[in-house]
Amino acid sequence: MAFTPFPPRQPTASARLPLTLMTLDDWALATITGADSEKYMQGQVTADVSQMAEDQHLLAAHCDAKGKMWSNLRLFRDGDGFAWIERRSVREPQLTELKKYAVFSKVTIAPDDEHVLLGVAGFQARAALANIFSELPSKEKQVVKEGATTLLWFEYPAERFLIVTDEATANMLTDKLRGEAELNNSQQWLALNIEAGFPVIDAANSGQFIPQATNLQALGGISFKKGCYTGQEMVARAKFRGANKRALWLLAGSASRLPEAGEDLELKMGENWRRTGTVLAAVKLEDGQVVVQVVMNNDMEPDSIFRVRDDANTLHIEPLPYSLEE
């Protein structure tokens, strides 16, 4: 019997979030094992995995030959190989692409649906988990393993934890936190990722963007010093020739409907509106505010006004918790 996801509640912004335990069903886990795992991943993703410590996790992109991302992966070491978390909607096609050259290497690449993905965030999240686990991850040690459980630490938008565990531990955790924590589903974690400026690549946007268009260079997800990987030439050209004119932005405001991944928005130009950008993700918060993650030109004026197409309501730019200055 699979672990049952929690019923949805309207997500809350990080500043007002009570202690919350989330089931992360919209995300999925995959692994690579075998003697050639590190070498294989080094030739496939934008990050320098050979430099990754056991207690580190990072966001890397897996690109096609043109440097466009199939997906981004939250990557960490796992046994003799690696595990990563990505949006469930892109896992199958991403693994198909990743496996294309695997026949020549000693690796096994597979989806993992045995483990349960949970998120813990909100008021005193660390204190709540400290009662359950003997050690918690932190800024200095971002990945901690305990038995069947791996805990990943995130700083933004406020301290939170992603837990990869077995069904028994997931049930135990739920039982222990049920009284003090709100239960919610993937939408709450999605809202936190949007607020943190972590790019969300779902199926609609797979194969559409180079990593820099989603700020991956600002998140430490691209190494410009490592050897060859698929799409490297285009990713390097975007940096060294200034070919990338796009960036990921956070918008907030009102909208009568939520824009979908892949949709464009409209930018106010004097009295008129002009189509712009590509939506990666959007969530409506419990206070009625809509937050939107969108890829647009990187030279937008900070006071620009946007809207969902033909809508009466407007959206404005919110600051991200990191700098895009290189």
Swiss-Prot record:
GO terms (BP aspect): iron-sulfur cluster assembly; RNA modification; tRNA processing
InterPro entries hit by this protein: GCV_T_N, GcvT/YgfZ_C, tRNA-modifying_YgfZ, YgfZ/GcvT, YgfZ/GcvT_CS, YgfZ_barrel
Gene3D superfamilies found in the cross-reference section: 2.40.30.160, 3.30.70.1630, Aminomethyltransferase beta-barrel domains (3.30.70.1400)
Main localization category: cytoplasm
Chain residues that bind folate: 27, 189
Keyword vocabulary terms for this entry: Cytoplasm, Folate-binding, tRNA processing
Purpose of the protein: Folate-binding protein involved in regulating the level of ATP-DnaA and in the modification of some tRNAs. It is probably a key factor in regulatory networks that act via tRNA modification, such as initiation of chromosomal replication.
UniProt record similarity statement: Belongs to the tRNA-modifying YgfZ family.
Protein name as it appears in the record: tRNA-modifying protein YgfZ
Organism the protein comes from: Shigella sonnei (strain Ss046)
